[in-house]
């Protein structure tokens, strides 16, 4: 039986160093992250010269526009999270994966394995969408596996002998659903004997990308006001952790209706509204959080960021959340009544077979 496995391949500009990796997405299960493993192959000349080869995990966090940068001021942090010397090999025990074992047999004596562990507290791969005309680097978090040669890992790398391969830190949806979201809000009015009550319920807490969200709305009007319109929307919350005032929200799907309205005093109304948040409907809007880009066409809205606790939030990164918001409009003098329910929007964890089929064969 012949067993095929898929790998990503990238060479340095001078063709002296080649990197092989079997995946570019690494799953964060909140408590730990999958190890980053690969194989580095050196040219015979580098081996004879006994060149030192280093591998690093680099996190690039851009928190401002390139056009706004001035001399001496950069809105970007580049952090080296892990650094290792691969060649000459250091004395360390590496537990090889099956892919590494097969590649070592295939590629010969100039092949060297490496394994790096990403810190669990490192942020997820998220970038903020730009306008189509903007060709500058997007704001957000991106990861790279960097391979270079030098006397030490602090040396400045030369472009011709350096490899930078983009990877992503991703989170997949939990296997179990949480508690069904439900909220009730009431509002009383001056010179009104009763209250206006709004009850909102979602059919579940966890949704997958592209799935329809059912918003169940129940309005009980015991006041002397008149409900003239109902609006339901999905809002994406973006928190740039580096800044104290770095929180903002974007409405990514909405629906409004006057069906059943005006809702007069003493009346009640039950209604179900359906919302589908997608990136296709927001592809021309700047500031929408999307999945980290590694030159793929299947980019989607950024998934909800899961963290073990509020104390685990790092000093950098972008935290994404989602909520359904329902508004009752009561006219110019009556104001509004709002209810909000958070929910989780994520991808289901793909099977290993599906991952291999999606990755294709060897990519440069």
From Swiss-Prot:
It is found in: Cell projection, Rhabdomere. One of its GO terms (biological process) is sensory perception of smell. One of its GO terms (molecular function) is opsin binding. Keywords: Cell projection, Phosphoprotein, Sensory transduction, Vision. Pfam families: Arrestin_C, Arrestin_N. SUPFAM superfamilies: E set domains. Phosphorylated, but does not undergo light-induced phosphorylation. PROSITE patterns: ARRESTINS (PS00295). Its main location: other. GO terms for cellular component: cytoplasm; rhabdomere. SMART domains: Arrestin_C. Gene3D superfamilies: 2.60.40.640, 2.60.40.840. Expressed specifically and abundantly in photoreceptor cells in retina and ocelli. Regulates photoreceptor cell deactivation. Arr1 and Arr2 proteins are mediators of rhodopsin inactivation and are essential for the termination of the phototransduction cascade. Involved in regulating normal cycles of per nuclear accumulation in brain circadian neurons and thus is important for normal circadian behavior. In the dark, functions with Arr2 to promote the formation of cytosolic Bdbt foci, which are required for dco localization to photoreceptor nuclei where it phosphorylates and activates degradation of per. Belongs to the arrestin family. This is Phosrestin-2. It comes from Drosophila melanogaster.
């Amino acid at each position: 039986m012949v067993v095929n496995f898929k790998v990503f391949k990238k060479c340095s500009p001078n063709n002296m160093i080649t990197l092989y990796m079997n995946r570019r997405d690494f799953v964060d299960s909140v408590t730990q992250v999958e190890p980053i493993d690969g194989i580095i192959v050196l040219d015979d000349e580098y081996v004879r010269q006994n060149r030192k080869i280093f591998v690093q995990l680099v996190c690039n966090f851009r928190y401002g526009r390139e056009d706004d940068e001035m001399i001496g001021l950069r809105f970007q942090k580049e952090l080296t999270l892990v650094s290792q010397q691969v060649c000459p090999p250091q004395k360390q025990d590496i537990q090889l994966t099956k892919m590494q074992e097969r590649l070592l047999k295939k590629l010969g004596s100039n092949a060297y394995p490496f394994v790096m562990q990403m810190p669990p507290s490192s942020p997820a791969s998220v970038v903020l969408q730009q306008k189509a005309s903007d060709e500058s680097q997007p704001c957000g978090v991106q990861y790279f596996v960097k391979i270079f040669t030098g006397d030490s890992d602090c040396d400045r790398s030369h472009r011709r002998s350096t490899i930078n391969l983009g990877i992503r830190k991703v989170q997949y949806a939990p296997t179990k659903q949480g508690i069904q979201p439900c909220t009730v809000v009431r509002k009383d009015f001056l010179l009104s004997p009763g209250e206006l009550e709004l009850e909102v319920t979602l059919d579940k807490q966890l949704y997958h990308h592209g799935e329809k969200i059912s918003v169940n709305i129940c309005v009980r009007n015991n006041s002397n006001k008149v409900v003239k319109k109902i609006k339901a929307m999905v809002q994406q919350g973006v928190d740039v952790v580096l800044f104290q005032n770095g929180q903002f929200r974007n409405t990514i799907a909405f629906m409004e209706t006057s069906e059943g309205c005006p809702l007069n005093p003493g009346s009640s109304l039950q209604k179900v509204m359906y919302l589908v948040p997608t990136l296709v409907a927001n592809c021309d809007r700047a500031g929408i959080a999307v999945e980290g880009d590694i030159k793929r066409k299947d980019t989607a809205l950024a998934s909800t960021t899961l963290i073990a606790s509020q104390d685990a939030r790092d000093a950098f990164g972008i935290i994404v959340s989602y909520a359904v918001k329902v508004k009752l409009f009561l006219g110019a003098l009556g104001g509004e009544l709002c209810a909000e329910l958070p929910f989780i929007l994520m991808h289901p964890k793909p099977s290993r077979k599906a991952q291999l089929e999606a990755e294709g064969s060897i990519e440069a």
